[in-house]
Amino acid sequence: MSWQTYVDDHLMCDIEGHEGHRLTAAAIVGHDGSVWAQSATFPQFKPEEMNGIMTDFNEPGHLAPTGLHLGGTKYMVIQGEAGAVIRGKKGSGGITIKKTGQALVFGIYEEPVTPGQCNMVVERLGDYLLEQGM
């Protein structure tokens, strides 16, 4: 299965039990910042934004004072799982990032999708990739 298929079929799909509700953007990005696959709507990010995200996974709390930036959009960092999941909020939407052995799985959402639904979609794929040694 191609990485693009994972994005299209497992991240940008309808959310279980909520037909028509889906993430607004998603991607799988290597730890080095190389894009493995992304939705057409995923923002163009700067290398320093990806460096900040990777630093926060290695040093939890790093982004809390400044916020998480992706594609020039600033998200307020909210509770996550140290070294495993970063979550951010901006207005009625937000972002979830799950770290696997080799990649970062990104999901960006807006209402009516809820933070919990975004977390479920992103973390389920991230957990699957971890189980596969990725």
UniProtKB/Swiss-Prot annotation:
SMART domains noted in UniProt: PROF (SM00392)
PTMs per UniProt: Phosphorylated by MAP kinases.
Annotated positions of the Phosphothreonine modification: T114
Keyword Zinc included in the entry's annotation: no
Function: Binds to actin and affects the structure of the cytoskeleton. At high concentrations, profilin prevents the polymerization of actin, whereas it enhances it at low concentrations.
Quaternary structure note: Occurs in many kinds of cells as a complex with monomeric actin in a 1:1 ratio.
Subcellular location(s) per record: Cytoplasm, Cytoskeleton
Organism: Olea europaea
Record carries keyword Cell division: no
Name this protein carries in UniProt: Profilin-3
Gene Ontology cellular component list: cell cortex; cytoskeleton
Motif Involved in PIP2 interaction, residue range(s) on this chain: 84-100
Transmembrane segments: none
Signal peptide positions on this chain: none
Disulfide links within the chain: C13-C118
Pfam families: Profilin (PF00235)
Family affiliation: Belongs to the profilin family.
InterPro entries hit by this protein: PFN, PFN_euk, PFN_sf, Profilin_CS
